[in-house]
UniProtKB/Swiss-Prot annotation:
This is Large ribosomal subunit protein eL39. It comes from the Archaea. Residues 32-51 are annotated as: Disordered. One of its GO terms (cellular component) is ribosome. One of its GO terms (molecular function) is structural constituent of ribosome. The gene is rpl39e. GO terms for biological process: translation. Belongs to the eukaryotic ribosomal protein eL39 family. It comes from Pyrobaculum arsenaticum (strain DSM 13514 / JCM 11321 / PZ6). Keywords: Ribonucleoprotein, Ribosomal protein. It holds the Pfam family Ribosomal_L39.
Length: 51
């Protein structure tokens, strides 16, 4: 990908990077492991973004 990106695309990629995280440990502890993984997790090679 080009180093010089449009600002809108850069913001969308940054938001996707931040949202691609595990739930915090305190959430897993508070829900007694009922919530262990995020339904919105995305693997960089399997699922591509429409950014």
């Amino acid at each position: 990908m080009a180093r010089n990106k449009p600002l809108g695309k850069k913001l969308r990629l940054g938001a996707a990077l931040k949202s691609n995280r595990n739930p915090p440990v305190w959430v897993v502890a508070k829900t007694k492991r009922r919530v262990t993984r995020s339904p919105t997790r995305r693997h960089w090679r399997r699922v591509k973004l429409k950014a």
